[in-house]
């Protein structure tokens, strides 16, 4: 069986007196469009990008939606998936002239941070973790080689550590 999108349904979190609604979108877990395996291993849940696109497509038809609450708890994910989700939410909010409120539960790192930038207001707990986290950086040190072949260099910089990734340092 291939990936599928579960039936999207409207859930009333708190009964109100009017018809207006807030669209709740959860970005929970790694951001990717790879389908997730279910416990049986046969079925697969759809990837996050497709799921959010489907939510926004359905919400496009509901004129009672007056705002979006984007609830993020993600360590990040792929750049492309994060970028697509960011732009899908920005496009939806601009088409419908809505505000997007972001709530960071525990973590919005890397791609989670990127997606959060689609919001107008970001609300975080003081102990929530956020930021762009680089997992790996490689620095090549050519200082010894350049000395052997007689190449000299001069670095012009505006601050002490501006050249920290320079291969000549």
Model-derived regions, located:
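Small-residue-centered hinge/linker elements
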Residues: 1-98, 104-169
């Amino acid at each position: 069986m291939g990936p599928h999108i579960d039936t999207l349904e409207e859930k009333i979190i708190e009964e109100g007196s009017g018809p207006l609604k807030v669209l709740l979108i959860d970005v929970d877990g790694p951001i990717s469009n790879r389908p997730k395996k279910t416990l049986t291993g046969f079925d697969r849940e759809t990837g996050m990008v497709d799921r959010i696109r489907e939510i926004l497509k359905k919400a496009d038809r509901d004129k009672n939606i007056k705002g979006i609450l984007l609830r993020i708890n993600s360590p990040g994910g792929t750049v492309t998936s994060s970028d697509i989700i960011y732009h899908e939410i920005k496009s939806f909010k601009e088409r419908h002239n809505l505000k997007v409120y972001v709530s960071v539960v525990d973590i919005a790192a890397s791609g989670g941070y990127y997606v959060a930038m689609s919001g107008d207001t970001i609300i975080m707990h003081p102990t929530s973790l956020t930021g762009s986290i680089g997992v790996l950086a490689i620095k090549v040190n050519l200082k010894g080689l350049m000395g052997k072949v007689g190449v000299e260099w001069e670095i012009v910089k505006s601050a002490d550590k501006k050249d920290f990734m320079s291969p000549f340092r």
